[in-house]
Amino acid sequence: MKTYTENQIEEMRRISDETENLYSPYACRNAQACRQYYSKYDTEFVRSQFSVDADKIIHSPFFNRGSDKTQVFSFYKNDDITRRAAHVQLVSRIARTIGKVLRLNLDLIEAIAIGHDIGHTPFGHRGEFYLNEIYSANTGRFFNHNVHSIRVLQILSG
C-alpha cells in the first residue's frame, strides 16, 4: 500500500475540494456515497467511491459477458447492429458530456452509465416487457432492468 506524505495528502485534498466546489447544488457529492463495507484504506481524495464503483463494474464478469451481445436480435448478419460494449461506451460519453454541462459528479455518472445494462434480459426491452408482465402478475411488483443491474452487481457478484 502506497503511503503519501502530509504535503501530498494536503494537495490531493485541495484538488478534491476544488473539484467538488465546481459542482452544481444538485450534484451528488462524493461524501454522499453509501457503502455496505468501507475499507480502512479508502482515500476519497485519490479515487472517489464512484470511481471505484466504475472500475468494479468494468472488471465484473457480468460486464464482460455482455460485451459481445447485440442490442437487438436479427435473423441475418448485419454489421450495423450495435454491440452492448459500444452502446455502453456511447452512453457513458454522452452522459458525461451532459453531466459536465450541468456540473454534476462525472464519476457517479460514469458508474451509472457503464452499469445500466448489466441486468438486461435476453431480447432487450421486448424481453423486459414480457418478464415484467409475468413478474407483476405473480408478485404485484415490477421488473426494471436498471434496478436488476444493481441486484446483479450486489448479490450475484458477492
Q: What are the residue ranges of the model-derived segments?
A:
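A sequence-level detector of short, solvent-exposed, charge-rich linear segments
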Residues: 72-77, 114, 128, 137
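Active-site flanking loop/helix segments enriched in acidic
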Residues: 38-45, 49-59, 63-86
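Sequence-structural signature of the catalytic-core scaffold of metal-dependent phosphohydrolases
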Residues: 2-42, 59-64, 89, 93, ...
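Alpha-helical phosphate/pyrophosphate-handling elements in metalloenzyme active cores
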Residues: 76-108
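Alpha-helical scaffolds flanking conserved acidic
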Residues: 51-52, 102-115
